[in-house]
């Protein structure tokens, strides 16, 4: 039986490699959301974003040139 969804059965590191340079949304365990351009991600899920924005309770809180997020704080990464 074939997978109907292209994301099923994919290696997460391959997906992350494909979206380098793309706009992403990163949600933290605390509920804070960052949106920006993915510059790098490592094996520990540490993330570097460029032109990033921080959203708290759905409202823009701050804009950053660069943001570095420690991997153990990441709930998920979503390509926009």
Curated annotation (Swiss-Prot):
SMART domains: Sm (SM00651). Keywords: Cytoplasm, mRNA processing, mRNA splicing, Nucleus, Ribonucleoprotein, RNA-binding, rRNA processing, Spliceosome, tRNA processing. It is found in: Cytoplasm; Nucleus. It holds the Pfam family LSM. One of its GO terms (cellular component) is U6 snRNP. GO terms for molecular function: RNA binding. The keyword rRNA processing applies. Residues 11-80 form the Sm domain. PROSITE patterns: SM. GO terms for biological process: maturation of SSU-rRNA; mRNA splicing, via spliceosome; tRNA processing. InterPro entries: Lsm6/sSmF (IPR016487), LSM_dom_sf (IPR010920), Sm (IPR047575), Sm_dom_euk/arc (IPR001163). Belongs to the snRNP Sm proteins family. SmF/LSm6 subfamily. Component of the heptameric LSM1-LSM7 complex, which consists of lsm1, lsm2, lsm3, lsm4, lsm5, lsm6 and lsm7. Component of the heptameric LSM2-LSM8 complex, which consists of lsm2, lsm3, lsm4, lsm5, lsm6, lsm7 and lsm8. The LSm subunits form a seven-membered ring structure with a doughnut shape. Component of LSm protein complexes, which are involved in RNA processing and may function in a chaperone-like manner, facilitating the efficient association of RNA processing factors with their substrates. Component of the cytoplasmic LSM1-LSM7 complex, which is thought to be involved in mRNA degradation by activating the decapping step in the 5'-to-3' mRNA decay pathway. Component of the nuclear LSM2-LSM8 complex, which is involved in splicing of nuclear mRNAs. This is U6 snRNA-associated Sm-like protein LSm6. It comes from Aspergillus fumigatus (strain ATCC MYA-4609 / CBS 101355 / FGSC A1100 / Af293) (Neosartorya fumigata).
């Amino acid at each position: 039986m074939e997978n109907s969804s292209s994301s099923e059965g994919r290696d997460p590191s391959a997906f992350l490699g494909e979206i380098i340079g793309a706009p992403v949304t990163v949600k933290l365990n605390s509920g804070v959301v960052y949106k920006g351009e993915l510059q790098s991600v490592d094996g520990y899920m540490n993330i570097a974003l460029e032109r990033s924005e921080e959203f708290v309770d759905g409202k823009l809180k701050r804009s950053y040139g660069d943001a570095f997020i420690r991997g153990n704080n990441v709930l998920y990464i979503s390509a926009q």
